Amino acid sequence: MTIHDKEKDKEKKDKKEGTLRLLTSGEIALAKSVFRSTIPYHKVWIHFDSYLPFGLQDQYTAMAPNGEIYFREHYREDYSHTVPFYQHMFIHEMAHVWQREKGLNVIGRSLVSWAVSYHYVLDSRYLSEYPMEQQAQIIADHFILNAEGYTKWCDLRDQDVITLDGNISEPIIRQLYQNTLRGFPW
C-alpha cells in the first residue's frame, strides 16, 4: 500500500456510510479506456453504502445491480488514483453497469452471484457466451494486463484477484483475451 492509498484510507474513514457521488473525471477516463462511450457516465453514482436494506451487503462486497455502484469497506474517493487491486474492482463493477446498459438483467442474476464461480477458461467463446460474473472478470483481468503489465497481472492472479485458469504464458493469454474480446465493447 502506498502513502497515497494510506491518505485515501484516512479520507474514506472520515466519510460516513450513506453518502454518494458521481464518477470523478479520472474514473470516467479510466472507464472510457475500457468501455469507450457505451456507458452514460454522467448518470453513474458511486455509493458508500449497502445496496441491501439494513446494511446486509457484506462489508467487502461491491455491487452494481441497478446501474450504480455500491461499495462499503472498499469505497474510495477516486478509483483512478488507487492501486491496481481497487482499479480492478472498479472496472469489474463498471462491467456490470455496462451489462445493464446492454439489457442484461443484472439485478436478477446478481441474486445468485455469490454462489457462482468467478474463475474462467479462455477458449473459442465470445465474451457474450460467458456468464455475467465471468464476463466482468474477463474485462477487469484484461484491463489489468493492458494497464499494469504481465508481472502485476501475475501478482494479482497469485492473490486470486485475477481468476483465469489454464495456461498463463503471456503470448498465449494475450491472444486468448484478444479472441474472447473481439468486438468488445459493442
Where are each of the predicted segments found?
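Alpha-helical membrane-targeting segments
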Residues: 1, 51-60, 64-66, 102-123
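Short, contiguous pre-domain boundary segments
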Residues: 1-17
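Metalloprotease/metallohydrolase-associated module, dominated by Zn2+-dependent proteases
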Residues: 12-15, 23-33, 39, 104-186
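Auxiliary, metal-adjacent structural segments of Zn-dependent hydrolase domains
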Residues: 15-66
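Short pre-active-site segment immediately N-terminal to the catalytic Zn-binding motif
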Residues: 37, 56-62, 69-91, 126-128
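Short, solvent-exposed loop/turn segments at secondary-structure junctions
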Residues: 49-53, 69, 75-77, 95, ...
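Active-site recognition of the HExxH zinc-binding catalytic motif
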Residues: 88-100
